[in-house]
C-alpha cells in the first residue's frame, strides 16, 4: 500500500485472526526469512485495503478503536478530510464540534497532539489519560 510518500507491506499474524495489522516500510526491510509455511488465498481472511487506509494515520500499528474528541479549530472540514471515518456527532457551539472516528494504532494520538488547543479528547478514557501524560511531559521540556 502507498501512503505518505512510502510503500508499505501490511501483514497479519498467520493464525488467521485479523486482530491488528502490522506495517513494514518496504524501503526499510533489510532481510526476509523464508519459513516453510504455505498458504493459499482461500486460507486468508478478507482484507479491505480501502477501509484500512481510512482508519490508519501515519501507518502506526495497533488495534482498532473508536475515539471521540471536541474540536474548536478554524476548519472542521479539514478534520473530516484528514480522518475519513470521522463524523460530527454533535454541534457544541458556534465553532465547536464533537467528532467520532475509528482508527488503528497511535497515529491518531500524534495527529491530535498536532492540533494544539483546538482538540480535547473525551473518549476512550485510556486515550484521555495518554494525552494528559504526553502534554505534561511536553510542558516539562519547557520548565
Language model segments and positions:
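Polybasic (Lys/Arg-rich)
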Residues: 52-143
